């Protein structure tokens, strides 16, 4: 699936122009890659926010730059640490027929039998590297943990193959495990050492 983002070209200098754009609710950005020279652009922050909210970060974003209609992926976004405002975004122009690699979120599905029995869920990977043509890139990878008992674990190798994409993360990497809940050790009675004052010789 792809969505359209309206962008406009911008000047690189003066530097104050970028701050002015941000003040107006716009985001300075750059697009580069397949069949396009590195080009500075800008767009309305609310437009990209809506795309990410409704379609995710791995969706193909169409835009028109220098009279060309191109397909892009958002490759990097710089956010303000305190406000979350977009400060700068990089878009990678892609060939829709060539394989592209991205990170996809690991989404756990269900409640494991082991957790219901008192175990603890330990998730070791939160994203995995996947490869696919841009139109087939997944936003997330679903992992069903319903049947996991205490002591069970799932690795990348345990995931079913998917016809649309390939998972490139090491097959031996552990995704999730169900471990016994840790309990605080109880103090044994009588183990506390009592201090006695030495008897004084009369």
Swiss-Prot record:
Superkingdom field: Bacteria
Pfam short name (any one): Ribosomal_L25p
Keywords attached to this entry: Ribonucleoprotein, Ribosomal protein, RNA-binding, rRNA-binding
Chain intervals for the UniProt region annotation (Disordered): 182-202
InterPro entries, per database record: Rbsml_bL25/Gln-tRNA_synth_N (IPR020056), Ribosomal_bL25/Gln-tRNA_synth (IPR011035), Ribosomal_bL25_b-dom (IPR020057), Ribosomal_bL25_C (IPR037121), Ribosomal_bL25_long (IPR001021), Ribosomal_L25_dom (IPR029751), Ribosomal_uL5_bac-type (IPR020930)
Gene3D superfamilies documented for this protein: Ribosomal protein L25, beta domain (2.170.120.20), Ribosomal Protein L25, Chain P (2.40.240.10)
Gene Ontology CC: one annotated term: cytosolic large ribosomal subunit
GO annotation, biological process: translation
Cited SUPFAM superfamilies: Ribosomal protein L25-like (SSF50715)
Gene Ontology MF: a single term: 5S rRNA binding
Positions with biased composition (Acidic residues): 185-202
Family note: Belongs to the bacterial ribosomal protein bL25 family. CTC subfamily.
Primary role: This is one of the proteins that binds to the 5S RNA in the ribosome where it forms part of the central protuberance.
Assembly notes: Part of the 50S ribosomal subunit; part of the 5S rRNA/L5/L18/L25 subcomplex. Contacts the 5S rRNA. Binds to the 5S rRNA independently of L5 and L18.
Protein's name in the database: Large ribosomal subunit protein bL25
Protein's organism: Enterococcus faecalis (strain ATCC 700802 / V583)
């Amino acid at each position: 699936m792809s969505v359209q983002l309206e962008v406009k070209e911008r000047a690189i200098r003066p530097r104050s122009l970028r701050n002015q754009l941000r003040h107006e609710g716009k985001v300075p950005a750059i697009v580069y890659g397949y069949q396009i020279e590195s080009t500075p652009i800008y767009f309305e922050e609310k437009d990209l926010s809506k795309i990410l909210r409704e379609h995710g970060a791995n969706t193909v974003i169409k835009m028109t730059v220098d009279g060309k209609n191109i397909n892009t992926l958002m490759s990097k976004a710089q956010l303000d640490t305190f406000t979350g405002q977009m400060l700068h975004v990089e878009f990678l122009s892609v060939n829709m027929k060539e394989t592209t690699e991205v990170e996809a979120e690991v989404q756990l599905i269900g409640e494991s039998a082991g957790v219901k029995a008192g175990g603890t869920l330990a998730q070791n990977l939160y994203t995995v590297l996947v490869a696919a043509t841009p139109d087939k890139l997944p936003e997330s990878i679903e992992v069903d943990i319903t049947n996991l008992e205490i002591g069970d674990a799932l690795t990348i190798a345990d995931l079913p193959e998917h016809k649309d994409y390939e998972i490139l993360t090491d097959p031996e990497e552990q995704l999730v495990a169900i471990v016994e809940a840790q309990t605080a050790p109880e103090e044994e009675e009588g183990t506390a050492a009592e201090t006695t004052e030495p008897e004084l010789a009369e």
